[in-house]
Amino acid sequence: MSEKIKRLNFKHLQQAAWKGTKKSIPATTLCLLLFFMNMALFGYKNAVIAVPLTIIFNRLKDFSPDRWHPYSVMLINLVLATTAHLADMNVWLCVTLDFAATYLMVFLLTDSDTSKAYYSYGFGLVLYQSFSTTVPELRLRLMAIVVSSAIATLGLVVMYFLKRRQTGFKLDPRIFNPFVHLGGKTREFLKGTARAFKNLAAMLRFHLFWDPSEPLESGTFDFRLTRFAIRISLLVTFSFFLEQVFNIPKGYWLPLNVFIMTLNFYEDSMVKIKQRVGGNIAGVFISAILLHYITGFTGHMIILSIGTFLGYAVDNYLFRATYMTCYAIALSTLFMKQSEVFELRLAYVLLAAVIAVIGSRFIFANKKTDFQT
């Protein structure tokens, strides 16, 4: 009986490993292609473009082609790169632009309590700002985004042809015509922006002057969304402010972790914080062991590639955070001392956890228990 159980468990592990491999190969291939291509053609600062575009690709590859919106994806990234360039000029622009960009991004790209369409673009904003650019470098970054977006879209087309019999989706060539979709998207953006700022003003009037506002009736989706968008914008902006004022090494790890840990509901944020902190601690420990035996540029790239593959292969966020920490450390230790990287990684994730806990608990908090009927 025990032998039969062992065979069943081994078969289950094989099936899970094969499922994870099939899931990870497309995203890993695109991520590494964009990473090394941008590093070679556009400089190491633009290698980070691979991260947000791969997350977007990984989300869209299972959607029907009419939901890809390739020009919108490219334009949003171009706007975020330009915003990040301007925000890096001084503290006042940092506070103003980072708050506005994060607020609009979260508000306009969230259509349900569990939606995380904004997630990949938040990565882009943080990474674009952290790897700052001069004006000539900005032009290079915009070119890199255009090229990378085209390659990511090509990847979606390849995935469509590989899976079309299984999904039954139809590919309408008109989705690649910018004049067909951008007009409607522009109108949606303007209406959404007006609604976003109207809700922001109403929420602030209510909390600052106790002026009840009709558009924000308590318990509605708009009410929860506006509170969440304000909260995450305040926390991310505060983190960017600390990074810019103190000019701390690897400072972008702070706003990035705060952004990841802050979710719509307090209960979900607490789960994500525990997983993120646990994954980072495990990732630092594993990286310390690996880097003791694996040295040199090639060795670091091997760890980076394996971390990327495993990160996209698993669904459990604790393991994903572990593997992606190995990815980040393998890259960072090429330019900094290992001990310093380990210390900074742990310090930032713990500080980010404190910020996210306080913010999720006390700043425009949304608790599931408050909205249960």
Each PLM stretch: what is its role?
Residues M1-Y323, L331-T373:
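Alpha-helical transmembrane segments and their membrane-interface boundaries
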